[in-house]
Amino acid sequence: MEIKQYIQENEERFLNELFSLIRTPSISALPSHKDDMLACAERWRQLLLEAGADEAMVMPSEGHPLVYAEKRVSPDAPTVLVYAHYDVMPAEPLELWKSQPFEPEVRDGRIWARGADDDKGQSMIQVKAFEYLIREGLLRHNVKFIFEGEEEIGSPSLNAFLKAHKELLKADVILVSDTSMLGADLPSLTTGLRGLAYWEIEVTGPNRDLHSGHFGGAVANPINVLCDLLSKVIDADGRITVPHFYDDVEEVPAAEREMIAQIPFDEKKYMEAIGVKALKGEKGYSTLERNSCRPSFDVCGIWGGYTGEGSKTVLPSKAYAKVSSRLVPHQQHEKISQLFVDYLTQQAPDYVQVKVTPLHGGEGYVCPIDHPAYQAAEKGFEKAFGKKPLAVRRGGSIPIISDFEQILGIKTILMGFGLESDAIHSPNENFSLDIFRKGIEAVVEFHQQYNK
């Protein structure tokens, strides 16, 4: 049976299985969802067995459990290790959703729900391609699966798990569907990712909240101080001012800049899609270079003082911010983390206390386009989408990808099917049914090409 027919005859079942996963709110960041995490892992274990795995198990870690499964074809055949994650981001703000985030709906040819794309929908693509190959007797190499439950919080337990289970996870290449394409009719393969460093900043002033009339103008306001500190991290040219930050940043090669310049990109439509009137970033680089090949710094959240209804004239005792920096390959997140800690604490005035706490991070990654598995993925996209995919770097981070290379000694192929319009991490996350189908076709072709 051809793959298109198989998808058509089984799509209702595929979606029912996906929806059973989505209805389990596996939010790794919230301790209140610990039972949901275990339930989602167990559901994946069942689905992997039903798809054709020889064995599947839920394995403990220092945090949330992982799911491992494998299909053994031959000890002499190569092995593909499929990585995915079953945890999702919190759904807030709930009032911005057009439908319930954990009650999936199909509208306008798209699945709407938290995890529809990131990463339950994309994970299901991998599993259903595997299922088809097993049932049709087309699989010629070994396949292993490792699904983790902490990707959305920086994979804090996975590094130790990899080191403890190197033999179990031994493979020739890793396949990941957790990235995006340039467009529905513009398939692309991700050749690189940025790294990440993330901190929480706490600024403390007086020992209690003060009356802004009695003390305002005489006592430093921690929120004002925090805003001033953060405003100095980036200069007028969009460069990060932290000393030695750029020491390990390599200039984008001219050949790669030429490739990026050839990517179809409508800056006006880009601005319209995200609702901004102008773009801003590092001087001397294009928008696509800025958000993929160059480092960046962002304030992800800032709070303090009174934020309830009405007014309260208060000079707050504390102010907080969560900030992140996207890194490029060769920048080490631990080194960058310490540079930021040193810089912000040294910049702090003596009338407040500043505490900077690194939260999580990881290194960037680059995949060579001459790797046999990359070329198999390229042919997979061409078969399913009717055109050769563009090779692009992406601005997001999957910190564990660099750990795979360092610990397991193998490359990762980033064969993702998401779109920017899928609104991952945001209200109204969605995933195209058409791309879901084409994704299964592409992964099937990947495995068949990799056999060769």
Please give the residue ranges for each predicted region.
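N-terminal helical capping/dimerization or prosegment-like subdomains
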Residues: M1-L94, K318, K335
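Active-site nucleophile and cofactor-binding loops and adjacent substrate-binding regions
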Residues: M59-S61, G115-D119, L390-G396
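Glycine/charged-rich beta-loop-alpha catalytic/anionic-binding loops adjacent to active sites
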Residues: F102-G115, N207-D209, K383-K387, I424
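Fold-level recognition of mixed alpha/beta catalytic cores in primary-metabolism enzymes, strongest
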Residues: A116-K280, L288-P295, F404-Q406, N428-D434
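A generic structural motif
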Residues: D117, N207-D209, S325-H333, G362
